[in-house]
């Protein structure tokens, strides 16, 4: 008996360390899968010349990628309760690596646009899984930081794409895809040898004290909600989950806000280098790469620092104190965002972009955390899949193409019009976040009243 306890403890510790290793692998996958975006956006002229594209067709690279994500998110949401998390993630990573090699097989623009759609399709299983896994297993006080880390890894991936193009040369922009494919194959191997248990989303209920258990049983609303979950668990499917989520006001407002924040961020990264080269007229590629590298690190890292500074104030995204600071972050991000289109030099454009990304990167993890945590744990993966579908349809899939169309039509007269139009959409998120803050505070007030009633019953 004495020997069994230390062995059990060692097993728990190994489990925790291995879960941390799994988080590192998954977060790095999120980053590496975005290297392709950096490779394409840093060599816009060379890609368009090599594949004989105009701005609108180049923008379809981003659009096709998003529509691949839409299809994948839909399938993942529908099959979420039936498929293995391990194998959906592993196969997604493996096939993503294989499809990257297609850029070395053909120069046909239409074929490669379709391949970019396949990239988006295979990217979604790990992209959906990681945030839900963090919300399930991470220490509560560090959830926002870990979600920010995942977001930071995505930006670093784009930065690595710029650096690879600088190393190999813009005319050899395809070579970076080999580096990306190689690392993803290594990650595929790591996932293959990992036990299914480490991908499990089984819900764990912490042991309650006698007093907490008594309060829980007295609270009728909580008890009835738990009973309803048990009765409906076997009847759940994608469409029933969709019906429940569509009636959830906090969830829908979170999705609308995330669509805007994530979509504008995606479009900015996709077209920023082209904006610097063709609107600011910065022709020094080394200078553009250096500035973009600074943007990639300073923006999200600044957002992470801002979240750390705000932590004593907002505690976590589950706290009611996070609501109104989130609105202020978004207003500030919107102001800096629209100012990017009016900048005249590379330096001022870089500074405005960094300021925008700092506040955007601070707000996005909080919105994403609220989105996942405001619904039942069983609905987390489906809810995030639906959020991804709507994000790709409404913003991430349309804004790169919209930028290209506006740029093709008006770049001779108003070269900065496309950037101004896209970044002005950032203000649309403000009223959604105001409504979200109001409804969250109202919900917390109701929960406090129910808690007080429960305590009164316990005293009696």
Segments predicted by a language model, with ranges:
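Structural signature of the two symmetry-related core transmembrane helices
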Residues: 87-101, 321-338
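Helix-breaking motifs and short loop linkers at transmembrane-helix boundaries and internal kinks
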Residues: 52, 84, 105-110, 122, ...
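Conserved MFS/SLC helix-loop-helix module at the cytosolic interface between two early adjacent transmembrane helices
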Residues: 71-110
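Extracytoplasmic gate region of multi-pass secondary transporters
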Residues: 40-41, 248-304, 364, 368, ...
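Cytoplasmic helix-loop-helix junction between adjacent transmembrane helices
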Residues: 115-154
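Symmetry-related core transmembrane helices of the 12-TM Major Facilitator Superfamily/SLC fold
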Residues: 175-193, 417-436
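Cytosolic juxtamembrane N-terminal segment immediately preceding the first transmembrane helix
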Residues: 1-35, 49
């Amino acid at each position: 008996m004495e020997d069994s306890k230390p062995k059990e403890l060692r097993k728990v510790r190994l489990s925790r360390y291995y879960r941390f290793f799994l988080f590192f692998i998954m977060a790095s996958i999120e980053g590496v899968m975005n290297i392709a975006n950096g490779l394409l956006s840093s060599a816009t002229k060379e890609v368009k010349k090599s594949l004989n594209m105009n701005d609108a067709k180049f923008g379809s690279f981003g659009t096709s990628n998003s529509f691949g994500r839409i299809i994948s998110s839909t399938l993942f949401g529908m099959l979420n309760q039936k498929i293995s998390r391990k194998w959906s993630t592993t196969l997604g990573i493996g096939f993503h690596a294989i499809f990257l090699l297609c850029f070395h097989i053909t120069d046909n623009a239409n074929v490669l646009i379709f391949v970019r759609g396949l990239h988006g399709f295979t990217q979604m299983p790990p992209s959906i899984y990681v945030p839900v896994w963090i919300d399930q297993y991470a220490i509560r006080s560090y959830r926002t930081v870990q979600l920010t880390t995942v977001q930071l890894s995505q930006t670093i991936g784009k930065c690595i794409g710029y650096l690879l193009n600088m190393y190999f040369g813009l005319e050899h922009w395809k070579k970076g895809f080999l580096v990306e494919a190689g690392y993803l194959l290594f990650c595929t191997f790591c996932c293959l040898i990992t036990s299914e248990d480490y991908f499990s989303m089984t819900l764990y209920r912490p042991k309650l004290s006698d007093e907490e258990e008594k309060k829980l049983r007295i609270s009728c609303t909580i008890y009835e909600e738990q009973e309803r979950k048990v009765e409906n668990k076997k009847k759940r499917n994608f469409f029933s989950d969709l019906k429940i989520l569509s009636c959830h006001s906090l969830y829908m407002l979170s999705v609308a806000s995330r669509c805007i924040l994530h979509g504008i961020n995606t479009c900015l990264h996709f077209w920023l280098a082209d904006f610097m080269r063709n609107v600011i007229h910065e022709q020094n590629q080394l200078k553009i790469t250096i500035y973009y590298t600074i943007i990639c690190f300073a923006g999200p890292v600044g957002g992470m620092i801002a979240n750390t500074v705000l932590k004593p104030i907002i505690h976590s995204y589950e706290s009611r104190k996070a609501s109104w600071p989130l609105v202020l972050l978004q207003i500030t991000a919107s102001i800096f965002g629209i100012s990017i289109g009016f900048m005249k030099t590379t330096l001022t454009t870089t500074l405005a972009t960094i300021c925008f990304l700092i506040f955007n990167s601070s707000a996005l993890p909080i919105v994403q955390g609220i989105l996942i945590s405001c619904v039942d744990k069983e609905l987390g993966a489906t809810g995030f899949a639906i959020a991804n579908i709507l994000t790709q349809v409404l913003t991430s899939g349309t804004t790169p193409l919209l930028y290209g169309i506006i740029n093709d039509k008006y770049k001779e007269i108003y070269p900065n019009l496309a950037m101004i139009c896209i970044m002005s959409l950032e203000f649309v998120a403000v009223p959604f976040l105001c409504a979200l803050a109001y409804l969250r505070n109202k919900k917390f007030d109701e929960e406090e009243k129910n808690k007080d009633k429960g305590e009164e019953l316990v005293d009696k």
